[in-house]
Amino acid sequence: MKISTEFYNGVIIFFTIGVYFLLMNALGFADVFYLRILNVIFVFYGVNRAIQVNLAAGKKNFVSNAVSAMMTSLIGVFLSIIGLIVYSYIKGGDAYVQSLSETFLFGGNPSVMTYSISLLFEGIASSVIVTMLVMLYWNNQFKAD
């Protein structure tokens, strides 16, 4: 059974983001908001890798590559959010999320699900942006109609 390019690279995004955040937590930098933004680098890597694999396989249709790029980033985002939910409950649930939200853009006391849903929307928005940027970067490699 062959794993799809999108799923494989989405899992790479998930693992790299997970290792990055665990490393930040272990080094005591989990509360530094600006370091959290660097996770977009891992999304760029996974999406770019998916497009490179598609181009190497001779898939040069712009739309199918855009869908592939978007699916790759969304798989990475969804897996990362699921990982965050599991990790948050392991670390104490709502109390853990409230300690995170002190350095994030929340007011009040968000629950694990509120925090995760807001990060899901942020992740979907960043997936669209990353997909557009990577597709623009590789634009000259695709067939013109």
Report residues per predicted region.
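Transmembrane alpha-helical insertion/packing segments
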Residues: 1-54
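Hydrophobic alpha-helical membrane-insertion segments
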Residues: 69-87
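Transmembrane alpha-helical segments of multi-pass membrane transport proteins and ion-pumping complexes
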Residues: 14-18, 44, 77, 81, ...
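Functional transmembrane-helix hotspots
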Residues: 83-103
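Cytoplasmic juxtamembrane regions at transmembrane-helix boundaries
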Residues: 136-145
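Hydrophobic alpha-helical transmembrane segments
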Residues: 109-130
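Cytoplasmic juxtamembrane interface segments
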Residues: 44-71
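Alpha-helical transmembrane segments of multi-pass membrane proteins, especially transporters
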Residues: 9, 13, 40, 64, ...
